[in-house]
From Swiss-Prot:
PROSITE patterns: ZF_RING_1 (PS00518), ZF_RING_2 (PS50089). The gene is rnf170. This is E3 ubiquitin-protein ligase RNF170. The keyword rRNA-binding does not apply. GO terms for molecular function: ubiquitin protein ligase activity; zinc ion binding. It comes from the Eukaryota. Disruption phenotype: Morpholino knockdown of RNF170 results in developmental defects visible by 48 hpf, including microphthalmia, microcephaly, and loss of motility. Neurogenesis in the cranium is remarkably reduced, specifically in the mid-hindbrain region. The chain crosses the membrane at residues 27-47, 210-230, 232-252. It comes from Danio rerio. Pathway: Protein modification; protein ubiquitination.
Amino acid sequence: MEGSVCVDGAAAPAPDEASLIEGVSNAVLLVLVLSVTLLAGLTTLLCRSEQQRIHPESQERVRVVREQLQAEQVSSESRHQFYSDMSCPVCLQQAVLPVETNCGHLFCGSCIIAYWRYGTWLGAISCPICRQMVTLLFPLFQDSEQSAVAADSPVEPTLILTDISDYNRRFSGQPRSLLDRLRDVPTLLRHAFREMFSVGGLFWMFRVRILLCVCGALAYLVSPLDFLPEGVLGLLGFLDDFFVILLLFIYISIMYREVVTQRLAG
């Protein structure tokens, strides 16, 4: 009788006390939590441009600039609306000569320049929406649109482009934290790839550098030699692949910012 009890006790599997959830290993739980966190962070970065509400700390300054612009400009009925899906949160009208900040928010060219001039010319402004430091302004209007806009608007496109170039020349090279670099990645990547596949956009050396970086990242992803091999660590082995992709995006955004800075300096 005692022998059978011993046999039954030896046959019973020992419970896995190290696992937080029965039947699911801790490695799988860790990868799941990290993946959800990474996806949530990327979704937040990509959707930041959808938020167009003025930050409470910038409301008073925006109100003064809005009143100043309304006093200087003609009535809104005479403003030609080229962009049906883009509005400026400063003047509360359709964006004329639209400009995008490095944090991904859209303003009229004259509005963001007036917002800069109302404060101080000695330092970079903070975005009226997210309060991130604005170190780059991207004009979203083309040369072919300037004459049509100038016919119906008192704003001179050439002066706006000059002010934008002056702003970028002053503040595009300012040091930024790692968090600010991550926040800039979606906007800079979008502009970099847009210029990369356009005629007369980025010069060929920069395009070759991007292609080499992409090829290097792809070679690492398909290579069986990993810092964290999937065959040994399971799902944890994909963490280094996510890290390589993230570094690739950050490096391309840094290269594109350097190209924009050199273009302004030249």
